[in-house]
């Protein structure tokens, strides 16, 4: 098992690395040339800038049983299609049971924005320590579940 993080503007990289290190699981952070990262623990892969370049690279290297951390529903759907696990930075698990509805809602919201002429959305609220703790707990559960299924 390996952990892959869609790391462009991802607020939980530190938590992912800490938890992964506690379980001796390797982590790969993927980012584009606009968000270059460095890490003492993780492998960092920098992908050329371009729409979805990081997403396609991540999906090309993840495998069955790996864990993908991403806020992108499309990446999550492709990871699930490869029988990998996927988790949002909020701690919500993407599953085969919920991904279709999430993708449909994203599509309908995009359509509504186009129709109304509103293309700029308000950003997410400021992240709290409770958000971080919720993600850590959910991520830990996912790791344990994946490890149990691996054995």
Regions found by a protein language model. Name each.
Residues 2-151:
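Nuclease catalytic cores that cleave nucleic-acid phosphodiester bonds
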């Amino acid at each position: 098992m390996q952990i892959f993080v869609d790391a462009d503007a991802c607020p939980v990289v530190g938590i992912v690395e800490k938890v992964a290190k506690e379980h001796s699981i390797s982590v790969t952070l993927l980012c584009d040339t606009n968000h270059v990262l460095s890490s003492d623990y993780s492998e960092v892969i920098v992908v050329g800038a371009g729409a979805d370049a990081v997403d396609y690279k991540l999906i090309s290297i993840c495998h069955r049983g790996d864990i993908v951390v991403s806020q992108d529903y499309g990446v999550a759907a492709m990871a699930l299609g490869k029988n990998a696990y996927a988790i949002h930075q909020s701690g919500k698990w993407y599953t085969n049971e919920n991904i279709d509805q999430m993708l449909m809602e994203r599509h309908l919201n995009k359509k509504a924005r186009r129709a109304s002429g509103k293309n700029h959305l308000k950003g997410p609220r400021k992240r709290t320590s409770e958000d971080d703790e919720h993600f850590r707990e959910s991520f830990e559960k996912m790791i344990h579940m994946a490890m149990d299924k691996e054995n």
